[in-house]
Structure formats: C-alpha cells, structure tokens
C-alpha cells in the first residue's frame, strides 16, 4: 500500500507546496520553515518513494506530478528544488488553473548536458547510478558534497544535508536510480514557453549541477519569468543564503497575490 507523506504547518494565509530534490526528503526545508511559517501555510511533501512516502516504485515525471497534485490545495504556490523543480513544473503544465505561481530552485528544464545546452555530463549521472548499487551511503554523500561545493559554509551544509538523508529510512535503490534516470532524460524546455502561471527561478552562482550558463538560455525560453542568481550560493541556496532566499519568496508571493 502506498502512503504519501504530507505535513502542513504555518500561520500564513497563502499555501506553499515545497518539493525536495533527489535522494532527500521534506526535512530539508526545516532550515527555512521558521522564517516562512508566519507568511505561508507550508505543505511539506516527501516525494513518492522518498523519506516517509513508502510503497512506491520508480515513477515517471507525470506519475509523480499526478500523485502530489492530487493532495495539494487549489491555488497554491509551488516550489520545487532540483528534481522537485521538474515535478513542480509538470504540475503547473498539467494543472495551471490550480497553481497560483511556480518557483524553481537550482533546477533546469534539462539537467543533462546536450550539445550547446550546459548541464551535468550524462556519464556522471550514469556513474552515480552504478555506484548506488555498490555503496549507497558513499554515493549519496558524494552527491550531497557536490551540492554545496564552493560555498563558504560547504562543510557545515553538507553535514546538515547528510543528517536529513539519514533521519529516515533510505529510499529503495529502484527509486533512486529512477530519479537519476529522470534527471538524465527529462526535457521540459518546450513546456516552459507554454506555462500559463507566474514563474520565479532561483539559482546559485557556484552551482556545479545547474551551471549559471543555463540562466540566460532559460530566460529566452520563458520570457515572462524572472530569475535571481544568489552570489556565493551553490545548489542549495535556501541553506547557504536563507535570508535573501526567503525574502525572494515573500516578494514573489506579494506580487502574485
């Protein structure tokens, strides 16, 4: 039997659904929940197969989007980090009438490098998938290290991310390799131009997984969207730069209210 973990907290009058990235769970948002809880009703979700959402196998992007959208309040803002950004974008494309606004964080419509499109080399993601079967802890630790690489608080932030992963049972290898496959193969670039919801895109200047070179390319794909690049941040700007990150969210919410 499948069970989707969904926790609601906060005293604000605006619903905000938060979707985490690959290998993690909703505990990753605990770093900024206290800052956001007075502004929003926060909906903290473990993506299917991750954290406390048990009983799922590897899902497609469409299946994952359908699963989380079925539980969400109508008219919410949606925020997706990394892989969660692909899921949130798919929700906004499928159900624009139910989404008041979309925020993607350190996310790309295509994560994998492709010709002139900057991104993660395919062989890197394929290597992670192979290594997962041999040593889960080491592979996830290496991936988390890449997310904070270059920031002033890299060591501290990586330790904190590892504690989030270890706080709950590890996802099944099938789910993790399926998630890596989504990062390797998903391409929602065409969908961006067709989105009928306000879009804010947040990036880290030092991000090694979603390089800043992608920002002007997505600007061209989604001319109505707005992008912010946090100097000194990498793949997890909400951890390394929580104050300006939360301010950007609150400003976006007020503009779209």
UniProtKB/Swiss-Prot annotation:
GO biological process, alphabetically ordered: biotin biosynthetic process
Protein name: Pimeloyl-[acyl-carrier protein] methyl ester esterase
Assigned protein family: Belongs to the AB hydrolase superfamily. Carboxylesterase BioH family.
Main location, first listed in the record: cytoplasm
Reaction catalyzed: 6-carboxyhexanoyl-[ACP] methyl ester + H2O = 6-carboxyhexanoyl-[ACP] + methanol + H(+)
Function field: The physiological role of BioH is to remove the methyl group introduced by BioC when the pimeloyl moiety is complete. It allows to synthesize pimeloyl-ACP via the fatty acid synthetic pathway through the hydrolysis of the ester bonds of pimeloyl-ACP esters.
Assembly notes: Monomer.
Keyword Hydrolase: yes
Protein species of origin: Sodalis glossinidius (strain morsitans)
Pfam families: Abhydrolase_1 (PF00561)
Record-annotated AB hydrolase-1 domain positions: 16-242
Compartment(s) of residence: Cytoplasm
E.C. no: 3.1.1.85
MF term (GO), any: pimelyl-[acyl-carrier protein] methyl ester esterase activity
Binding-site list for substrate: 22, 82-83, 143-147, 235
Keywords on record: Biotin biosynthesis, Cytoplasm, Hydrolase, Serine esterase
């Amino acid at each position: 039997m499948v069970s989707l973990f969904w926790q609601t907290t906060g005293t604000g009058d605006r619903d905000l659904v938060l979707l985490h990235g690959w290998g993690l769970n909703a505990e990753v948002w605990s770093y900024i929940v206290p800052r956001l809880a007075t502004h929003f009703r926060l909906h903290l979700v473990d993506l299917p197969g991750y954290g406390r959402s048990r009983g799922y196998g590897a899902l497609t992007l469409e299946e994952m989007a359908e699963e989380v959208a079925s539980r969400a309040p109508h008219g919410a803002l949606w925020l997706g980090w990394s892989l969660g950004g692909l899921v949130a974008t798919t929700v906004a494309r499928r159900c624009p009438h139910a989404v008041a606004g979309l925020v993607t964080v350190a996310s790309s419509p295509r994560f994998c490098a492709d010709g002139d499109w900057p991104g993660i080399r395919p062989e890197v993601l394929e290597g992670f998938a192979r290594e997962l079967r041999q040593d889960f802890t080491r592979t996830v630790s290496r991936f988390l290290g890449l997310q904070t690489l270059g920031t002033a608080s890299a060591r501290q932030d990586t330790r904190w991310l590892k504690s989030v992963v270890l706080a709950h049972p590890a996802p099944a290898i099938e789910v993790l390799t399926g998630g890596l496959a989504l990062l390797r193969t998903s391409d929602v670039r065409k969908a961006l131009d067709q989105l009928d919801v306000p879009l804010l895109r947040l990036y880290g200047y030092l991000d090694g997984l979603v390089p800043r070179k992608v920002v002007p390319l997505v600007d061209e794909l989604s001319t109505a969207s707005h992008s912010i690049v946090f100097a000194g941040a990498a793949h997890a700007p909400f951890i390394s730069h929580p104050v300006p990150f939360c301010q950007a969210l609150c400003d976006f919410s007020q503009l779209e209210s």
